[in-house]
């Protein structure tokens, strides 16, 4: 994930929105369509919360991590075109300043993946990465499911793939030959 974020230059017109988009996807596990639908009114800066308009016309509030908020602020102050109309957070960098679509968000991820040398990756892979990071930091499947806004626990279980590398560190080495 670090390589993906590092390939975005926060000092450029395209780097700031890309960095904000990738951070939202990677840290909160948002879907591409949820990032595209994000509106300025969905961010409650005082409470440190973000309202996500998800599948099934759901509206869920999530905590807004400091790093995510900082990247959004950097984009809003120095990246979002002044002439942009409407309340959508992410808009095209060049006129006409229309809201980004979910396909445009997916393209941001794909381009960043290529620049980072990761090959072709999609926005949904960052959702899986977010779930894995939550699991590694001690989050329960229930907590992860709530953050990812899964309707069924079984869906969350799919995201909790076995981390073979971590298991190797926990497992004892094979003692030797069979008797």
Task: Set out the residue ranges of the language-model regions.
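Conserved catalytic core of the tyrosine transesterase superfamily
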Residues: 1-179
